[in-house]
Amino acid sequence: MCERALRHPETSRDAAVHAQVLITLACFRSEIGDASTALRLLDDVLVIDQQRLPAVLTARGMVLGRSAHPDAMPALNEAIEVLADLAEEDQQPGAGPSDLASALLNRGFLHMMEGELGAARADTEAAVAAARVAGRPGVVHMAKHNLGYIRYLLGDLPGALKAMAAASELVPDAVLAVPALDRARVLLAAGLLAEAGDHTAVALAGFTANRAMPDLAEALQVRAEIDLAMGDPGPASWAARRAARIAAKRGNDRAATVAELFELRAHALRRPTSDGSAASQRNHALGDARRAGELADRLSAMGLTEDALAARLLQVEAELDAATGGSPRSASNGAEGTSPGGSTWRSTAARGDRSGNLAIRLHARVLSARLELAAGAPAAGLIHIRRGLDDLARFQAKFGSQDLQSGAAVHGRQLGALGLRTAVETGSPAAILQWLERSRAVTTRLAAVRPPSDPALAADLGSLRVAFDRARQAALAGRRDPALEHRVAELRHRIRSRSWTAGGSGAVDRPLALSAARRALAAHPGTSVLALFHGTGHDHALVITARRARYVRLGEMAQTESRSRRVASDLDLLADARLPRPLRAVATGSLRGTLGRLSESLIEPVVSQLDDGPVLIVDAGPTAALPWSQLPALRGRIVSVTSSVSRAIAGLSAPERGAHVNGVLAVAGPDVSNGEKEVRAVAALHRDATVLAGDEATGRGVLDAIPADGLVHIAAHGHHEPDNPLFSGLMLADGLLFGYDVAPNPHLPAQIVLSSCDVGRTDERPGGEPLGLVAALVRSGVRTVIAATSRISDEVAEHAMIGYHRHLLAGLRPAAALSAVLDEVSGITDMPAPLTCFGGSR
């Protein structure tokens, strides 16, 4: 369009128009990576119209900045100085606040890239003011967005997401590639890989359509980093190579060299699984080491010190792989630090430990630990692992969002895996406990997430409740409504984005020591902790009692996972009262056999180590949602399930006074046979209990009626959301009551009983963080949740729940009350009751 305008005779007759067309064309040529043509066009502008000098200087600074040219900052400094002089002289033809806003915005961006964040913030805030005076909402939006990006660079991820979300509201209908890429970077840093990938896809599409090659190269680097975090080196390597080619073609050596770093990281990720002899693998590692060293030298010469350090750590890792054959326990002179290589390795890792970049620090901790392990010092290696995981926990504690807290665990995956191998090889129960508490379900060491009450969030949740229910009904009727489904997706995105902006307390609990756990158990005679964990292809158990602690290696993990899936499938089938008798007999036999085999592989090898009282099962993996009380070796035992030993021990000191004495709310959702009958029977057992049924059982009605520190009993069908537990929920009269609804509610119950749904199911994020409605409720501060881990028949639920409440009133604590009623139900019906007590409760 600009080139056509230049050919039009009217353009050449109007100097101002001619100059503006040339400036616009220069900016476009810069966007597609043709900096030399862009600079020539800007020189032509000054031949036509000298009064456009400030605009030309601003555009020149932008063009030079996008190609990382050292003259970019001087050009912008000169532009801003000229604009300031013109403003003082009140001479502003074509050189007013609009040009000043652009110049300040671009100089602020250059300051960001140089790490001068104070100067970046000052320029960007000034750009907002100038853009408002000039009436340029697009520049106001971009500057406010950049202020969010500065927060990201300062390490304030919730603040960054909040500022970026506020900026996007200034242009609500626009789909902008640059802001999408920046949000992807923040979400990647927070560990929300799928969400970061979605935003990167938007950015890639936008940059490709606009032929914005410099930005496309950056987006490809982010895509490569996401793939690396997902453990997928093939796509990461492809994206990094393409980014390097694009950057090199447009003469941006710095960007091309940084892209090489991502390709080298993909090589490192692929190296442990490469085929070939030991000699060929060693040669492969040495080749990677040479390349990493050369890359580190080039990055250092360019002034990219953090990237150079990352490359140097890759060099150390490759040389260490070559020296040890990839085994952290293989000793070598280099690893022991008795050769020049060993000394260099240690000093490089130590520099990484002091980096301001979390990913670099964690990588350095892995290497420091490997160096100690290779030198035959496992205790010293575990110290590095613990410090790295503590660093990660402090990072997670900055978030006031369960989503971000659990997502960030992905950054500790390599440290956690190394910690598992190391701790297990020591065989020390104390070391294993420290690893468990630091590396798995790290969010259990953080304060309960209680976001403040937010009217806008409440309104969005109400809208989502209605839209979700309408979309569900349309789908069930065979008439899917794409517009409604789009509305549901839009509301979910808005709700999640809002939750990400909350900051955390920053507090991290100290992991429980084995001696402290045993002292606590001594105050509760007969109680045992059975901590199960999974890795290196096997299941493992750590048994802790007041008198002893013992580690036991169990069976193969793959078999356990397969059997766990079979149990869930059989339980779902048996919950259907309409199941024909022959099929019921087959499913019952299958369930009994599988439960027996799970009992043999997981419980019987350690049952002799357990005391004869309650069993506190600690599991955050694929077996967490097993119906533990149904395993033969645990039948009749008082069993509760938590995700950490610290939380299990803390539950021992929960108030003896039951939650029901602080008030009871009983709720019946729609389409639950006998649901209203059940909740009215439950309410009749308790003094002054509140009942919500029929049209009264709405989301708002339930939230308003929750008794503080009391008991909430809900007979309603559930919805399990694998990707985000806070979108799991319970079906009420007006739609789903979401996990997002409960956390910010002013009143939170101490105990929630979910009698008619299978929201006790759980999934796991990379890094060992459990996902599911139960996990979300416990993280919000609910002390105990009684829920089914699979489907349960309405008839069994009614029998079990009325008996459960009777036992509570008789003075039993939740886990004991549930154990007693499960024994009773097994004598009434052969239909299973897969109910579990989650949380710290005996």
State where each predicted segment sits:
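Residue register of alpha-helical TPR repeats
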Residues: 16, 20, 55, 62, ...
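Residue-level detector of the short coil/turn that links helix A to helix B
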Residues: 33, 67-68, 115, 155, ...
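Amphipathic alpha-helical segments of tetratricopeptide repeats
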Residues: 3-10, 43-48, 78-91, 125-136, ...
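Catalytic cores of enzymes
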Residues: 516-578, 582, 586-842
